[in-house]
C-alpha cells in the first residue's frame, strides 16, 4: 500500500515564522534546498545570509547550517553569543566538533530511526501500519552560542 508523505518541516517553519512575526521579529529564510548535505552548499548559504541581513541577531538552522553560520560569523567579526545567537536543530555530533559547542534543539534520532525501521519491517511483512505519524520529544543542548 502507498502512503502520502506529509512534509512537517514546512508546517513547523510556517508556525515558527508566524510566532516570531507576531512578536515583531523579521524572519528571513535562506534555503539550501531539500536533501542537501554538502558543506559547500551550507557555507554558500551562510555567506548569503550575512550578505542579505548582516545586522541579524539570531540564526536557527540544521546543524550543518548553524556550524557554517558560526564560521561565517567569525570570519566577519561577529561576536557569538554577544551580538548574534545561533541555535542548531538536530543536535548531532556536528554541534560538538567546533571550537564552541552549539546550542541545539536535540531530536531523538536513534529513537526515530528505530520507529522507522520497525514500520518498514512491518510493511515488508505485510502488516497494516496503524500509526503512521509519530511525535517525538526534543531536548535542549546548552551550548556557547545562545
Task: List each model region and its residues.
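Hinge/beta->alpha junction and helix N-cap segments in small-molecule ligand-binding domains
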Residues: 1-21, 25-45, 58-67, 89-91, ...
Amino acid at each position: 500500500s502507498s502512503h502520502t508523505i506529509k512534509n512537517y518541516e514546512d508546517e513547523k517553519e510556517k508556525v515558527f515564522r508566524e510566532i516570531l512575526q507576531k512578536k515583531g521579529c523579521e524572519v528571513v529564510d535562506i534555503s539550501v534546498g531539500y536533501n542537501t548535505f554538502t558543506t559547500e552548499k551550507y557555507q554558500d548559504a551562510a555567506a548569503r545570509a550575512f550578505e542579505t541581513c548582516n545586522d541579524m541577531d539570531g540564526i536557527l538552522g540544521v546543524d550543518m547550517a548553524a556550524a557554517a553560520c558560526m564560521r561565517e560569523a567569525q570570519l566577519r567579526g561577529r561576536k557569538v553569543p554577544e551580538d548574534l545567537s545561533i541555535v542548531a536543530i538536530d543536535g548531532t555530533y556536528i554541534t560538538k566538533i567546533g571550537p564552541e559547542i552549539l546550542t541545539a534543539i536535540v531530536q531523538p534520532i536513534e529513537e526515530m530511526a528505530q520507529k522507522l525501521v520497525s514500520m518498514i519491517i512491518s510493511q515488508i511483512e505485510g502488516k497494516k501500519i496503524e500509526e503512521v505519524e509519530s511525535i517525538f520529544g526534543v531536548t535542549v543542548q546548552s551550548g556557547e552560542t545562545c
